[in-house]
């Protein structure tokens, strides 16, 4: 539905980086981690210790973040990330049938942004549904679930749902551009929802 779309150079680079990252991550995460740490050691040596980051660990490679300016098309990139992840995940699942993802969840900072994500997903022909506590997790099992972060709580109430009810092996995409939750609550929710899955 988005015929004639022309990627800007920085969008193209972000998508290309994601392709390379997911390819290495799903092909052999341990070797990928080793290669990253080799690069870190070289960077530290070449910078005489000025570049000195903590080493990567394989269990922490399931997170990938992009910082994008307002109006740079981060929503569109996020939706492309869904398609990219599912492509590499399905390819890896043919080799390792134990791989699983429970849900694809887009966490939006408020109800207005949730509706915007839903509209944009429809334009990208990605099946999606707004999370409604009464109706559960969408019409189809593989629908993308869009949820307002403010509806996630430790314990579900009338208008909220417990963050633990989503399980931990989800693909979670967080729109942090307009963060709606104070402190590190959004970080905790993202971490728990994607602990055994993946997060953008």
Annotate the PLM regions.
Residues 66-72, 176-180, 194-200:
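Conserved helicase ATPase motor motifs in RecA-like P-loop NTPase domains
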Residues 1-67:
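Conserved pre-motif I regulatory segment
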Residues 76-80, 93-123:
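Conserved Walker A/P-loop ATP-binding site and its immediately adjacent core
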Residues 85-94:
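Post-Walker A helix-loop "phosphate-sensing" segment adjacent to the P-loop in P-loop NTPases
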Residues 16, 80, 84:
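Active-site signature of alpha/beta-hydrolase-fold catalytic machinery across serine-
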Residues 101-102, 167-169, 196-200:
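Short glycine-/polar-rich loops that comprise or flank the Walker A/P-loop
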């Amino acid at each position: 539905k988005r015929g004639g779309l022309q990627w800007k150079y920085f969008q193209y680079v972000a998508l290309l980086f994601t392709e390379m990252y997911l390819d290495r991550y799903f092909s052999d995460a341990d070797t990928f981690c080793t290669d990253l740490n080799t690069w870190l050691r070289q960077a530290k040596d070449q910078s005489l210790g000025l570049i000195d980051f903590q080493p990567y660990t394989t269990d922490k490679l399931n997170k990938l973040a992009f910082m994008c300016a307002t109006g740079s098309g981060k929503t569109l990139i996020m939706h492309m990330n869904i398609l990219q992840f599912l492509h590499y995940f399905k390819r890896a699942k043919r080799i390792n049938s134990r791989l699983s993802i429970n849900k694809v969840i887009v966490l939006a900072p408020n109800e207005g942004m949730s509706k915007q994500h839903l509209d944009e997903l429809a334009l990208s022909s990605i099946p999606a549904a707004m999370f409604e506590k009464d109706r559960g997790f969408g019409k189809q099992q593989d629908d993308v679930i869009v949820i307002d972060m403010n509806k996630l709580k430790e314990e579900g109430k009338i208008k909220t749902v417990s963050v633990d009810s989503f399980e931990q092996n989800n693909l979670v995409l967080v729109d942090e551009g307009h963060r709606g939750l104070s402190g590190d609550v959004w970080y905790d929710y993202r971490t728990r929802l994607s602990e055994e899955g993946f997060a953008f």
